[in-house]
Amino acid sequence: MSDFLGIDTSNYTTSAAIYESPHNVLLQEKMLLPVKKGEKGIRQSDAVFHHTVQLPEIIDKLFKKTGKRDISAVGVSYAPRRLEGSYMPCFLTGISAATAVSRALSVPLYRFSHQEGHIAAALYSAGRLELLNEPFIAFHVSGGTTEAVLVNPDNEHIINAEIVASSSDLKAGQAIDRVGVMLSLNFPAGPELERLSEKSNAVFKIKPSMKNADCSLSGVENKCKKMLTENYEKSDIALFCIDSVIAALDGMYKALMPKYGALPVVFSGGVTSNKRIKNYFHDKYNAVFAEPAFSADNAAGTAVLSSIMYDRRK
C-alpha cells in the first residue's frame, strides 16, 4: 500500500486529496463553501453545515477519479496552527470523517495544522520537498492568516513553524476580499480583483505601515474607500490594494533578513496565487511559490505529510 488520503475542511473550502507516493502523483477535489452575494465571510456554524454536506460529495468525486485505492494512512487538518488555543469548529468536520476512515481501514491517522498543509502543498507543487530538511522562511498569506514563520525540521511533526512576523490587524486576504466586495465583486474576491487590476496602468509608490517585522493592513481598506469616493477607476483601486499587500510582505521579509539572513523563502496561501505577487517575489528573491491549484486551501499538503510521517514511523 502506498496511497495516502488527505482531508481539509477550512473556513472556505472542502478538500480531499490522494497522494500516490511511489509515483509522486497527487489527485485532489475541492469545493468552495457558498457565501451570499455582498457578504464578507461565513459563520462557523454555517461552515460546519456546508462541510458536512459537501465532504461526502468531494470524497465520492475523488475516488471516482482515482478508482479503488489501498490507503496506507489518513492525514487531516485539525486546527489553523499548531499552537495552544488555535481552534476553529469547521475543522471538526474533517476530523470526524478522517477518524471514521482511519478506524474502518485500520490505518494510522495523522493530524497536521492547516498552515503545515499549506507549506507542504507549496513545496510539493514547486518540486522542493527537500526544503523540509533545512531551515527556511515560509509566508502563509490568506484570508485568515498573514504570517512569516521560521520553519525548522522536526522529527515529531515534520514541520516546526515559529511565527517571526505577522499582520497586527487585517489579514491580506481580508483586505482583498473587503476591497473586492466594496467594488461589487464576488466573495472570495481574489481572482476577480486580480483580473480587474490588470486593466490598470497606474503606478503607485506605497510605503507599508510597519512595526519591526509586523505590518498593518487596515489602512489599505480605508484608503481604497477614500479612492472610491474620489471616483478613482475601479481597476486602479484594485491595483492599489494588491500593490499595498506586496509592499507589506516585502517590508516583512526585509525586516527579517538582518536576523535570519538569506534563507530560502516559500509562499503559500490563497493570496499568493496572484500573478503580480508571485512575479514580484520570484524576480526579487527567487522565492518558491505553490502552483495555483495548490495555493488556495487544499488537502494536498496533509496527504503528502501523511506519506512522510508514515515512512518515518514504519
Model regions: which residues?
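Conserved phosphate-binding catalytic cores of ATP/NTP-utilizing and phosphoryl-transfer enzymes
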Residues: 1-2, 107-137, 304-305
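A short helix-loop
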Residues: 2, 9-10, 27-28, 130-134, ...
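Short glycine-rich, Thr/Ser-proximal phosphate-binding strand/loop in the N-terminal lobe
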Residues: 10-49, 157-163, 289
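Short, well-ordered amphipathic alpha-helical segments that serve as non-catalytic structural scaffolds
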Residues: 31, 50-66, 248-252
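Short beta-strand-loop/turn "lid" adjacent to the catalytic site in phosphate-handling enzymes
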Residues: 60-99, 103
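Glycine-rich beta-strand-to-loop/alpha-helix junction loops that act as flexible
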Residues: 76-79, 142, 266-274
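Glycine-rich phosphate-binding/hydrolytic loop that grips phosphoryl groups
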Residues: 118-122, 290-314
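A contiguous, well-structured pocket-lining segment that forms one wall/lid of small-molecule binding clefts
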Residues: 191-265, 271-282, 286-288, 307-314
